[in-house]
């Protein structure tokens, strides 16, 4: 990674604002309007061509993609032969089965933990406002944070994720890493200045996001089960409770709003359509920023571990592969294309893996 100059200033609230320059990842333009370098340039003509609101085949293709990544029934999952499934498992073995090998690879290095929330620390539920983590999981994550620097990286609004997790000692990267804040003052032993890190590379988009959120609420209210969530720096349109026969209508309504906003892009997650600013920023970039903030940006003795279940987590898995450090763990019961090195099937296995990490660290405090 390119060398970075970091300018730090402290506000009255105790939050540290960090401006980073001379970097291939964090450019001075990161806080400028959408036309500045560092943003994805998408012409209005090209955007309309890609969305093709009036083209039925485009809508159908998008719905097929929604269906493929969000199966409602086991029969919706592409069938694999025993050889194909075994091949996938060999390429992405269980992190629990490979625990000793993982520990051996991290020996002599500082482990840094990155955790997605929905589907990783909490089960996927029909109502996104009720995606609560268990008390056992919360206690486990708290123990992990005492052993290693730990961050929650989620597509959710940072404040919403914090209201679920309620642990002041963690780093939180909400809105796919576009809203990053460190531990509450005095709660982290890894930040020597005991202050919080605040980084919001898409702050210029806040008024636009609010405007689009209101339009999406209005345009989708006639689709039963659709839920629009304002995650501050992005908007999520949940279709988990929408009848599959209505997915095409929902996609049409979402796209009819976005055709007026070339500054925003549409991405897809697990039973959710997500609208984000067109900046070169994702969970992988957030991972790099947090490593920089912790002093591990150009360090060979760091071992980042990222655990997540969604498409958006692939950016972080890919970043770890490119860095040649640490590894990613995909949480999924079914084989799927991924840049992760290992796999776990569900949040219960995530908790087992985290507990084993804590037990190992407590037995080897100097390692």
Regions found by a protein language model. Name each.
Residues 108-110, 147, 169, 232, ...:
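A general structural motif
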Residues 120-121:
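Hydrophobic "anchor" residues
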Residues 1-12, 97, 191, 199-233, ...:
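C-terminal cap/substrate-recognition subdomain and adjoining C-terminal extension
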Residues 112-114, 171, 305:
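Hydrophobic "anchor" residues on beta-strands that sit immediately upstream
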Residues 1-117, 126-128, 136, 292, ...:
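Non-catalytic pre-domain segments flanking phosphatase-related domains
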Residues 126-128, 164-166, 185-186, 249-252, ...:
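Short coil/turn segments at secondary-structure boundaries
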Residues 132-231:
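Active-site phosphate-binding/coordination module
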């Amino acid at each position: 990674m390119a060398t970075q100059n970091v300018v730090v200033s402290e506000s009255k609230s105790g939050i540290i604002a960090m401006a980073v320059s001379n970097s291939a990842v964090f450019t001075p333009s990161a806080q400028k309007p959408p036309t500045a370098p560092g943003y994805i340039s998408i012409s209005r003509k090209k955007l309309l061509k890609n969305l093709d609101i009036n083209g039925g085949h485009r809508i159908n293709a998008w719905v097929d993609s929604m269906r493929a990544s969000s199966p409602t029934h086991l029969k919706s999952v592409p069938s694999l032969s025993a050889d194909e499934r075994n091949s996938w498992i060999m390429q992405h073995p269980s992190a629990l089965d490979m625990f000793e090998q993982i520990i051996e690879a991290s020996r002599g290095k500082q482990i840094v933990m990155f955790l997605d929330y929905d589907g990783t620390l909490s089960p996927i539920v029909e109502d996104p406002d009720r995606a609560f983590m268990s008390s056992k999981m919360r206690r486990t994550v708290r123990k992990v944070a005492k052993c290693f620097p730990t961050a929650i990286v989620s597509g959710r609004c940072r404040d919403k994720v914090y209201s679920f997790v309620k642990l002041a000692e963690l780093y939180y990267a909400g809105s796919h890493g576009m809203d990053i804040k460190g531990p509450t003052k005095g709660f982290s032993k890894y930040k020597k200045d005991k202050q919080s890190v605040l980084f919001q590379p898409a702050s210029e988009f806040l008024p636009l996001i609010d405007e689009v959120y209101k339009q999406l609420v209005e345009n989708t209210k006639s689709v039963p089960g659709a839920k629009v969530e304002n995650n501050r720096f992005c908007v999520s349109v949940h279709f988990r409770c929408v009848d599959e026969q209505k997915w095409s209508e929902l996609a049409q309504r979402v796209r009819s709003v976005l055709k007026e906003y070339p500054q925003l892009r549409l991405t897809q997650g697990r039973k959710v359509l997500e609208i984000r600013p067109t900046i070169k920023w994702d969970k992988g970039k957030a991972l790099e920023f947090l490593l920089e903030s912790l002093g591990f940006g150009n360090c060979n003795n760091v071992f980042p571990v990222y655990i997540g279940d969604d498409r958006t987590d692939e950016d972080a898995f890919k970043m770890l592969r490119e860095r040649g450090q640490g590894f990613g763990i995909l949480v999924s019961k079914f084989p799927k294309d991924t840049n992760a090195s290992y796999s776990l099937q569900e949040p219960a296995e995530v908790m087992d893996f985290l507990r084993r990490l804590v037990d190992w660290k407590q037995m080897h405090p100097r390692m």
